Amino acid sequence: MGDDLITTDGTTLLGADDKAGVAIIMSMVEYICQNRDFKHGDICIAFTPDEEVGRGTENFDVKRFGADYAYTVDGGRIDEFSFENFNAYKADVTITGKSYHPGDSKGKMVNALTLGRQFDTMLGDNKRPEATEHKEGFYHLHHMEGDVSTTKMTYILRDHDMDNMHDMIHTMQLAASYLNQVNHGHYIDIDFTLQYKNMIEVINKTPDIVYKVKQAMINIGLEPIASPIRGGTDGANLSFMGLPCPNLGTGGYNYHGPYEFCSINSMKKGVKLLLELIKEA
């Protein structure tokens, strides 16, 4: 109650992820330009395209950027900040079957679509995005296409703990091996690609940047909440590139769907938070 919201008409995305973050940063810059007596340390600002497809830091030059540490403004609630995120892998599953006329296929046909369905079932319903929360990891089958002869499936694997991630990879390998064995051939191949890692491995070595966020939030009247991200940010990759980079909120909610909205009041608090942080820079 009493908040001002930005929404769409419900038929499209709002794009607050991450237009809201850009607006907060530029509002901070505007304030600095209009208030020349505002004292602050040296600051560096960058905007990265293609974050949503995992390529936001592909050409980012950390040395040229010139900062000792940074914060992405790409989260949700304005009183939340994050220095943990998922470890992320992509799994490309290729299934090569044997196609025969269905009327004369007994003992001969190996249906790649059927193997794909069986493979996915073996991963378990309790390890899917719609069944997990908090730090629970998941397999997400987000693309599948094919026919009897060839079927391709693309998964994303997510977990905050790398040991759990390795177990998930092993489970997929065991499922493929089992189906190959019971069908007396080699039909299923899996290629795994590391996408990003949990930034906490880096942030734990620089705890002062976490303390600065907590103190800045308290100073502007927020009660800080450290919340692990069930996703990733450019900050995860930047952290492993030598630029420790926790994530701050934007006041946006329900990202990536038609019910997305953003709180103007929260965005204003986001500007205050950045100004408080750079005073301590």
Regions found by a protein language model. Give the residues of each.
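Active-site-adjacent mobile loop/cap segments within catalytic or ligand-binding domains
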Residues: H140-H170, L174, S239-P246
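Acidic-enriched catalytic cores of C-N bond-cleaving enzymes acting on peptides and small amides
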Residues: F83-E84, S105-M144, D163-D189
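Acidic/histidine-rich catalytic neighborhood of metal-dependent amide-processing enzymes
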Residues: G2-F86, T132, E136-H142, M153-H160, ...
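Phosphate/diphosphate-binding glycine-rich loops and adjacent basic-rich segments that engage nucleotide
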Residues: A70-S105, V110-T114
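Active-site-adjacent substrate-binding region
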Residues: T114-A131, F138-H140, Y187, K197-C245
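Glycine/charged-rich beta-loop-alpha catalytic/anionic-binding loops adjacent to active sites
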Residues: M1-T12, T96-S99, I220, G252-H256
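His/Asp/Glu-rich mid-to-C-terminal helical/loop segments that flank catalytic regions of hydrolases
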Residues: V110-R128, D163-A175, Y211, Q215-I218, ...
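Short, hydrophobic beta-strand segments
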Residues: I95, T151-D159, F192-M199
